[in-house]
Amino acid sequence: MKYQNKLIFSDTETTGRDERDFIQIIQSASLLTDEKFQTLDSMNVSCAPLPWTIPTPGAYLTHKKIDTLQSSDTHYQMMKSIHEQWKTWSQEEPAIFITYNGHAFDEELYRKQFFWNLLDPFVTNTNGNGRSDLLMLTRLVSQLFPDLIDFEINKNGNPVCRLESVVGRLGLDTSNAHDALSDCVFMVELLKFFKAAQPKLVDDYLLQATKQGCAEFLGKTKVIGYRHQPFARFWTYPIKFLGINPTNQNEAICVDLNYPIEDVIDLSYQDIMGYLAKPNAESPFKIIRLNKSQGMADANEFDFKFDCPLAELNANAERYDENPEWIERVLVASTDLEQKEWPKKAVIDQTIYEKFFGNGDRNLFQKFHNAHSLEEKLSLCDRFNDSRAKAFGHRILFQENKTNLPAEIISSSKALIKERWTSEGPWPSVETYLSEAEELKHERTSPADQQIIVAVESYLKHNIQGVNHG
């Protein structure tokens, strides 16, 4: 299997950095390239903050997009245009969607905000499409080829893998960093550089962009070098693929080849279950998510500098292959684990993974997006079965037409605005960010920074005044 020939690089700028279920994309850029990184098409769109979204001064100091505070373009219009463009680009031939730290940030924002706007949230990894987080590859390169780039080194002695820092060390002009389109260009140039320097590493990385490709890579690779970095610190393991979890097709069960093979094979069924339940550093098992980018490469091709000799790791991998009954036992044990239950979310903005919209509603969504008259859209909203869909539909209509709506929709929208702007919750707090603005005015004294801080502060004060007197 070869990875897709089309690559779609995307990046966002947002109203905030924290409270990620409630911050909003206000700029999105995408670049479509071929497999040789030649640009085929691009898009760069922006919008105003939603009436119930609180912009934060720190975020605007980073991306400087204060013009969006007065934009006439709505969030719905922007998200719909992104969705339509991505579907057009990947319709005839699937694509790989590439972000930088996107699986922790941008990708989740796109998904949730497609969900808010009654659009398919999983456009980037369905219908043959794949998704990759370039940060994972950059971290692998910093470990396997530390001299390939003159990486900036942090106070802990580790390479800095922030996009702006890495491409700056390659000699690119980063004066316009944190503009979504500029960051897309940086990603293209960085991946092009990696491909020229280490084509096999990049090919394997891009193959892993889909679940099928990732499973193929795991299955054909005798010893896999796996860099696990949940936070600032990372661990590297030599692992072998055992199989897919029969009850969760997104999980690959692997075994750590560092452990004495006799000890692992002699584990009781209960011990196997216990280690699978907590596949941490002390466990001989590791669980790989097939639907997210991982830091993985062929340890027989690339030197991970494992303490255990490579010949011994290969011998261990072969011995596991000689024990198919034991492998089956491990896979059966993975099916006996209790599925983790996450606490229910009280706010519909956060419920994307709790329950998917039904087929009937999804069919109506497309009619809603295509409808031209307000009357038709209101009628379609009334036909939605899922109460969340009705609420999101009403929010969309309020963005687009605040005056000609039924009184109950206007009333519920104003109640939502008042709740977000005047009460405490999981969303950004106006008081917190007004205080932040005051502090930043003393810390960031350049005229350009002062202009940004004052613009956001004025927006917050004007809107809270309107809410309190509305």
Identify the role of each PLM range.
Residues 96-103, 147-213:
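Acidic, Mg2+-coordinating catalytic module of metal-dependent nucleases/exonucleases
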Residues 14-16, 103-104, 136, 186, ...:
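Short, glycine/acidic-enriched loop or turn micro-motifs at the edges of active sites
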Residues 1-119, 160, 168-170, 267-384, ...:
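Conserved non-catalytic scaffold segment of RNase H-like nuclease domains
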Residues 51, 140, 193-197, 260-263:
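Short loop/turn segments at secondary-structure transitions that flank enzyme active sites
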Residues 207-280:
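Acidic catalytic cores of enzymes that act on phosphate-bearing nucleotides/polynucleotides
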Residues 103, 109-164, 168, 222-223, ...:
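Internal, well-ordered alpha/beta segment that forms a basic, Gly-enriched binding/recognition surface
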Residues 47-70, 132-182:
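Active-site-proximal helix-loop-helix substrate-binding element of RNase H-like nuclease domains
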